[in-house]
């Protein structure tokens, strides 16, 4: 994000809350995926790759299960990323870094606004997924998605107000100009108890400011991370910026 705005808007999560109840794929229980008809509408399947960059979904051989904390039944499995996938994500972001940074801020703001519009279309399904995977009530799941939407609206407005200063110079015929510059590649880590909203607080602002980001969601809420990434990536892909946002 822009250097001077980093402190003001907190573009990185300050803490990582470790949640130790996630399970690797070792269970005799059948997956309950079919019991939740809203999952396919979010692009989810019984088995899902857990790493994304450059318009591609990838995964290694190790996997974990997403559980419904209400009854401890497995919902779906997610194949995890490898160290090599992580390096691929970094290289992909580096390859698109200059082009995204040099894109005018109002253009980036319009893309973020469209991300908010896409989230609006799927607010109900995402709220249900958050409720299913994390265990909070449905209205709070919807509220998390609304927080993301509201931050997209805020960020879109900010994209036209990030002005600098023109400072008088002691040299005749000269002046000094203050210009904000993006930080570059950043990481966003979110905890299990708020698997969606904190991403929005950080990612919407960082995108407008010209940063590229890698998201590390909580291991106990992987389906939420995948579903939200699918929504964000659809908008970015349509505008030719498939490597600005990665999930690993």
Residues covered by each model-derived region:
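Glycine-rich loop-to-alpha-helix module at the N-terminal edge of alpha/beta enzyme cores
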Residues: 73-162, 173
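Alpha-helix N-cap/helix-start motif
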Residues: 60, 86, 123, 141, ...
């Amino acid at each position: 994000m822009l250097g001077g705005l980093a402190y003001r808007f907190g573009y990185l999560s300050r803490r990582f809350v470790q949640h130790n109840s996630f399970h690797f794929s070792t269970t005799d229980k059948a997956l309950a995926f079919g019991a939740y008809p809203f999952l396919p509408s979010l692009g989810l399947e019984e088995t899902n790759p857990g790493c994304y960059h450059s318009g591609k979904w990838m995964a290694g051989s190790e996997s974990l299960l997403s559980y419904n904390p209400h009854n401890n039944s497995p919902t779906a499995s997610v194949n995890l990323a490898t160290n090599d996938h992580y390096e691929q994500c970094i290289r992909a972001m580096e390859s698109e870094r200059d082009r995204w940074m040099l894109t005018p801020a109002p253009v980036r703001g319009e893309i973020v606004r469209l991300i908010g519009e896409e989230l609006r279309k799927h607010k109900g399904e995402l709220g249900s997924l958050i409720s299913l995977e994390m265990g909070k009530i449905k209205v709070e799941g919807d509220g998390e998605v609304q927080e993301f939407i509201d931050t997209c609206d805020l960020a879109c407005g900010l994209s036209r107000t990030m002005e600098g200063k023109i400072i008088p110079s002691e040299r005749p015929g000269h002046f000094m100009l203050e210009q904000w510059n993006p930080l570059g590649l950043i990481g966003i880590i979110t905890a299990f108890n708020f698997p969606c909203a904190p991403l929005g607080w950080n990612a919407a602002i960082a995108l407008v400011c010209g940063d590229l980001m890698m998201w590390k969601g909580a291991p106990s809420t992987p389906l939420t991370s995948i579903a939200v990434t699918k929504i964000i990536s659809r908008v970015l892909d349509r505008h030719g910026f498939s490597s600005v946002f990665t999930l690993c």
